[in-house]
Amino acid sequence: MWRTKRGRTRRRDAGGNPWQNLEKTSVLQETRMFNETPVNARKCTHILTKILYLLNQGEVLGTREATECFFAMTKLFQSKDVVMRRMVYLGIKELSPIADDVIIVTSSLTKDMTGKEDLYRAPAIRALCSITDSTMLQAVERYMKQCIVDRNAPVSSGALVSSLHLASTAGEVVKRWANEAQEALNSDNIMVQYHGLGLLYHIRKADRLAVTKLVNKLTRQHLRSPYATCFLIRIACKIMEEEDASGNATEDSPLFNFVECCLRNKSEMVVYEAAHAVVNLKRTNPRELSTAVSILQLFCGSSKATLRFAAVRTMNKVAMLHPPAVNVCNLDLEGLIADSNRSVATLAITTLLKTGAESSVERLMKQIATFVAEISDEFKLVVVQAIRSLCTKFPRKHAVTMNFLSGMLREEGGLEYKTSIVDTIILIIEENPDAKEAGLGHLCEFIEDCEHTSLAVRILHLLGKEGPYSKCPSRYIRFIYNRVILENATVRAAAVAAIAQFGACCPDLLPNVLVLLNRCQMDCDDEVRDRATYYYTILNQSNPELNKRFIADHEIVSLPLLEKSLNEHLKGPLAERFDLSIVPKSQVIQPEVNEEVMIMNKAAPKIARVNREEVNTEKLLAIPGIHHVGALHKSCAPVQLTESETEYTVSCIKHCFAHHIVFQFDCVNTLSDQLLENVRVDLELPEGFVSRAVIPCAKLPYGDKESTYVIVQFPEDVPSSIATLGATLRFLVKDCDPATGQPDSDEGYNDEYILEDIEVTVADQMQKSKKQNFLAAWESADTEEWVEAEDTFELSSVTSLQDAVNTILKFLGLAPANLSENVPDGTFRGGVEVLVRSKLAVADGVTMQLTVRSTDMDVAELITSAVG
């Protein structure tokens, strides 16, 4: 006996997965044992476990294999073994999406669901709902209602959760179970109450008034379940956010009072959820924020690692938006730097980096360096994000942060981690001229041993863009040419393009660049040879205008739209040359910053980001006559022209071209007994505007969104392009059957609906573009080709610099440059370049001196008048 026990212990200590070498074919052959009589419950349970293991490891069963296995599994219902029966339920759930004719087990599952054995009932409900569709659900509806209000908590919870899953396919049937869900909400069991609230909210969520009544009722009574209370807090916050968005918020909100009361709940879970909600609500004032932060501060001293982690993670997020509110917790956060849990320590330091003083930066960076190698890439990303915000806050500390980042670059890590570091270094280079030389040097060292092609290409592009304007451009050519010798074809092609930039921008380096490009023409790769030949031919002509137009100019067209336009051109008769000017330029897309640090879903693929112009161009190309107005300059965000509760909802998107503006009206008919035809919008145009075309919507059925367009030509006089236009929606109404949507007769009557006025502003006509060096661009614009307009304004309605910047941006349609008081340049419709410099001073109000440089005097005056 002693030997047997020791042998088992040795096998267990040896570790390893006993099923890692399972083969699908052999396991499926073993399922023949399910047909034996009597059923060997122990062996069948073991086989079922193997099947579930294979399925959960991603093994794919064919429809025939799954069906045979499923039907063999149904033979096991004759056994009364509880463990095996529960495994059968799991097998049915896993195989039901693959196998055919799974409804054959409906009667067996219904019998178990309504039987006396409670251990069978809950899993039988879950299995039954996995094979039930909307057509079969009515047959078991009565049983489901009974199970929802069952006294046995697992049965009731199983029915409630299954109902939630069924709601996605049979929502109308599940809505009839609201009374039973309401009864479950009054249960004493914490899970039943939680699941009951979840189902009841799902049933009523489309009815805003019903949800509000439900929340108001529940906030006045004490919920036994902390899970339900947490969910109720989330619903209340969602309602408050909707009220804020619609402008119906009140200062003394009963819902906010409920959330604030939950800060004093006896459950730590509820207290944290309430604190998390308070700090994330936009309406929260400093007093309320300090109360929530005090709660989080208490949690920082908890003996539970989960509470400490939750508290410091939330404070990390608060520090992004309200650093002063977290300053009071700096001592507690310093104590967490030495926490045994590295996740907590990392978040504590990164929070301190956001809230601490400039003098503490070096000390904190040294503390991070002691354990940064021990943490995972996921937490290293959080450190990099904190350093990025630190660079914005303390630009003079760029030497410390740059050295730290370069050290992290040399360590082992994945592509996402290294990309985050490179992004941060590039941000420092672009926004801090003093850090440019050091940053480029660190990146040059990194590409000497970079295993990621995408990063190497990106860095080479940056070197080609910034290197020619550095103090010693020649030092970077050696690093770049090394890539031509040592790297793969993709990197070599990028290196050739970077070398050509030096030849175009640095005349003294041109002879050396031509020698290098001549060598590259011998490359074994077509792309590298073609690029080298292309750049060599242009540079060899020593024509600065050619160099600027074909090499140094970084403005490119939108590649997706270029591809689409070329395909359309090739499908045509090819009688005319392709006109590149009709393709919109690629605009700057700001990188998306994920404020929810520590939530990183690596399974979800990244969606390629496109700008608004690329999204809208496909629709616009279908408009008759649109090709004559030229390339799309800018598409604006939608503006609502009606209230959301009205019978017809209309939103307007303004598409600006060089000399025209296209108004796109997206219309929705919310009346089920009406069909609208010949839907159009008539505009009251001010003097100078000319209507060129109106494209109506032929039919607008109930619930559908359709578009109608109006093409308008701008006035010749640029200042007159700022105007307010009246708008009226006109249409033909036909009464119809709400069930079918078919009109009762062919006759109808004309009707109209007055819309909100439409404003055409400077911001609508201005497209942001990014200059890497604003100061250099500003100085280069001090020539005879440019005109300058300057004026001083008293912004009496604002009291802070941030409000002043926001006001300027609202009028001009530009974005603030990080780390400066400058507003980046932009391009007015028609390609007129614009540079704007704004100086702000705070006294009783904010005084602003606005200086505009542009290649068109009318545009310069228009921009200054927009603020005035």
From Swiss-Prot:
Subcellular location as annotated: Cytoplasm; Golgi apparatus membrane; Cytoplasmic vesicle, COPI-coated vesicle membrane; Endoplasmic reticulum
Species in which this protein is naturally found: Anopheles gambiae
Segments of skewed composition (Basic residues): 1-11
Function per UniProt: The coatomer is a cytosolic protein complex that binds to dilysine motifs and reversibly associates with Golgi non-clathrin-coated vesicles, which further mediate biosynthetic protein transport from the ER, via the Golgi up to the trans Golgi network. Coatomer complex is required for budding from Golgi membranes, and is essential for the retrograde Golgi-to-ER transport of dilysine-tagged proteins.
Name the UniProt record assigns to this protein: Coatomer subunit gamma
A single MF term (Gene Ontology): structural molecule activity
Membrane topology of this protein: Peripheral membrane protein
Quaternary structure annotation from Swiss-Prot or TrEMBL: Oligomeric complex that consists of at least the alpha, beta, beta', gamma, delta, epsilon and zeta subunits.
Record-linked Gene3D superfamilies: Coatomer, gamma subunit, appendage domain, Leucine-rich Repeat Variant, TATA-Binding Protein
GO cellular component, one term: endoplasmic reticulum-Golgi intermediate compartment
